[in-house]
Each structure stands twice: as structure tokens, then as C-alpha cells.
């Protein structure tokens, strides 16, 4: 479950960059937020450093100090995602030395990225006050897109009993703001809230949010996201012991994967296996446990964090 949570966080990142001026727009300076590739922070860092070099060589009349500071916060983020934590903090130290009272957005982004680097390095307790300060500052200054981000990060670093409240705060901003940049968070937040409720065994409520997430992904034309969101609906139905409907959904997903010649999905195989096991179809259960093991054993996060899960899949596939 935790891994699916982080997969959807990637969807948040991919879908929620701040579109200040489109690719370039009115401002002659490049919109670096539109150039983010969160799955490839190394190549993104190279692009951002090239922009930085161009900024250093630009005419004094076109220099924008806040833009410079914001760009550096995102360079630090690329470094943090690559586990270059010392370098990331050094980059953020440079930002801190540039800030003044007029740079509200840059200060907000500095807080967020300093917190994220601490969180990436496992020092989440240090990150928490930074995210909280960012949230409060964002509320005070009506910086909705970054306030939402801060609430979302608080929902990650807080203990489980507080995660739901923070995600609901983030969702409230996304639903009520006039900032269209925030709307891309709706689907991922529906997903996150669904998983939190699933973890609290509030399955009926979890299903409501998973269905909202599926509907949102479908409405915006996100086929891959909709397929994953549909999977969460099926997974929740299994928790509600609605196994026939859950199996129907997972078989539909598998049929689409095969029809479109998409990569095999270990999560779908795993869910099919569990459902076949529940209805006593041991032959299909064994087949899908084997397929699930083959795919999920390639997932570095699962290999590192969920060895018991892999051992169970292998054992049930070998029977």
C-alpha cells in the first residue's frame, strides 16, 4: 500500500508544476517549473544549471533576484532527489543569503525545499517545523499552490493519526482555490486520502475517495492514472469483501493491459492472485502469485522494504 501511495505522489509531481507563463510566456526568463522531470532529477538538474548559467550572463537590466532564488531552490530539490544532501543544503544556504522580505514566493519555496531535503535524508523530525512554517506563511500570504504543497508534505511527515487532517486541508485548498495550478492535485489527493482511510480500516469512506480519484483521472484523460485509480477501487472492494466485483475490476484492468500491449503490472497480478485464492481457484491463484513475484521482485523499493511480501508471493506461487 505504501508503495502505491508514493507512486501517486509521482503523479502529483508530474501533474502539478506551476505554470507561471507557460514554457516562456510574457517573462523572457524560462519557466523552469514546466521543465521538471521528477523521474529523472539528474537530467533536470543539468537543465536548471544551464538556465542558471544563462541567468548569470544576462544583462543587469533583465536580472530577477527572486527568480534566481526560486531556481536555486529547485536545483536543490534535484540534488536531494539524487541523495546529494550536502550539496543540496549548500545550494539552499546560497538561497538563504539572497532572501529579503519582498521575496515571499522564494522564501516559501526555500522552506519547502529545505524541509524536503531533510525528509529525503531521513531527518523528517527536522523537516516538520519547516513544512509547518511554510504552511502558515502560505496561508498568511495567500500562496495557495505552495500552501497546498506544504499541507501535503505535513501529511507525509506527521504520524498516521494526523495525516488525514493534513491531506483534507490540502484537498480543501485544491477544491476551493481560484488558482488553476492547484487543480492538478485533486486526483492524487483523493488517492492519498483513500489510502489513509484504508489504513484506518474505514473502507466505506476510503472507497468514496478512490472512486473520486478514478472519476477525476478519467475526466482529465489520464489513462495510466485512471488505470491505477481503478485498481485502488478494486483493492478497496476486496477489503469490503465484495470479491466478485473486485475480481471483475482487476480482470478488466488486465484485459486492457493485454489489449494495448502495456508492460506487465505486478500489482494487478498480485490482486488477481489474492482474489482467486479467496474464491478457491488455486490454479489461477498460483499462476498469478508467480507472475506477481516475477514483476514485483524487480521493484527496488519492495525489495528493500517488503521482503516478507515477496517471500509470501514466491511461496504461494511455488505451491
Q: What is each PLM-predicted segment?
A:
Residues 19-74:
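N-terminal leader/linker segments that initiate helical-solenoid repeat arrays
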Residues 289-291, 296-319:
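Terminal, low-structured helical/coil segments at or just beyond the last alpha-helical repeat
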Residues 14-15:
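C-terminal motif of bacterial Sec signal peptides marking the signal peptidase cleavage site
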Residues 52-57, 93-100, 132-139, 169-179, ...:
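Amphipathic alpha-helical segments of tetratricopeptide repeats
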Residues 36, 70-81, 109-120, 146-160, ...:
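Conserved alpha-helical positions within TPR/SEL1-like repeat arrays
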Residues 63, 102, 142, 178-181, ...:
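Structural signature of alpha-solenoid helical repeat scaffolds
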Amino acid at each position: 500500500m505504501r508503495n502505491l501511495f508514493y507512486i501517486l505522489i509521482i503523479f502529483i509531481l508530474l501533474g502539478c508544476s506551476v505554470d507561471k507563463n507557460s514554457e516562456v510566456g510574457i517573462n523572457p526568463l524560462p519557466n523552469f517549473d514546466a521543465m521538471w522531470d521528477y523521474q529523472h532529477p539528474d537530467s533536470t538538474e543539468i537543465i536548471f544549471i544551464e538556465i542558471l548559467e544563462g541567468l548569470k550572463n544576462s544583462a543587469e537590466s533583465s536580472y530577477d533576484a527572486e527568480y534566481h532564488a526560486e531556481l536555486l531552490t529547485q536545483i536543490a530539490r534535484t540534488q536531494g532527489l539524487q541523495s546529494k544532501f550536502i550539496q543540496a543544503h549548500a545550494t539552499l544556504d546560497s538561497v538563504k543569503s539572497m532572501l529579503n522580505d519582498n521575496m515571499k514566493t522564494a522564501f516559501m519555496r526555500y522552506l519547502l525545499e529545505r524541509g524536503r531535503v531533510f525528509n529525503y535524508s531521513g531527518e523528517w523530525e527536522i523537516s516538520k517545523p519547516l513544512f509547518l512554517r511554510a504552511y502558515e506563511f502560505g496561508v498568511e500570504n495567500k500562496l495557495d499552490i505552495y500552501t497546498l504543497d506544504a499541507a501535503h508534505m505535513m501529511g507525509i511527515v506527521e504520524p498516521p493519526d494526523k495525516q488525514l487532517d493534513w491531506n483534507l486541508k490540502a484537498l480543501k485548498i485544491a477544491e476551493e482555490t481560484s488558482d488553476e495550478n492547484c487543480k492538478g492535485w485533486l486526483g492524487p489527493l483523493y488517492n492519498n486520502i483513500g489510502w489513509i482511510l484504508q489504513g484506518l480500516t474505514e473502507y466505506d469512506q476510503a472507497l468514496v475517495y478512490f472512486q473520486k480519484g478514478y472519476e477525476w483521472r478519467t475526466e482529465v484523460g489520464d489513462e495510466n492514472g485512471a488505470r491505477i485509480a481503478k485498481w485502488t477501487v478494486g483493492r478497496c472492494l476486496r477489503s469490503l469483501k465484495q470479491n466478485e466485483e473486485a475480481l471483475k475490476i482487476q480482470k478488466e484492468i488486465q484485459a486492457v493491459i493485454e489489449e494495448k500491449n502495456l508492460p506487465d503490472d505486478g500489482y494487478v497480478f498480485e490482486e488477481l492472485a489474492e482474489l482467486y485464492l479467496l474464491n478457491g481457484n488455486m490454479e489461477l491463484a498460483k499462476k498469478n502469485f508467480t507472475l506477481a513475484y516475477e514483476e514485483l521482485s524487480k521493484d527496488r523499493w519492495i525489495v528493500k522494504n517488503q521482503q516478507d511480501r515477496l517471500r509470501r508471493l514466491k511461496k504461494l506461487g511455488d505451491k
